[in-house]
């Protein structure tokens, strides 16, 4: 009887250890978060985005339809941070963080800086009045 208890306890310990070990394996994220900061003038510009994975799919024109607003990245909108006031396409842009949305088309893209960071990837609630440019 004592031998059966020892065998059962050993088997239970091995099972518990293997489950714990398996839980520690780190697998790559399907759409990994990326960020970069670059010195610019006397400050920095930073970009934070999740890189979409195509997984064998046609992304533009299929998963992301042409002519529709897109969050410009996976999971949530891409964020761009200007450490100081800048000019973009001749327009003044105040220092701060903005969401980057786009409208991809077959031959060109339209890019928009968006003031409401809480919108994230929910393009259904996109409001033109929150566009900076």
List each language-model region with its residue ranges.
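Bacterial Sec-dependent N-terminal signal peptides
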Residues: 1-26
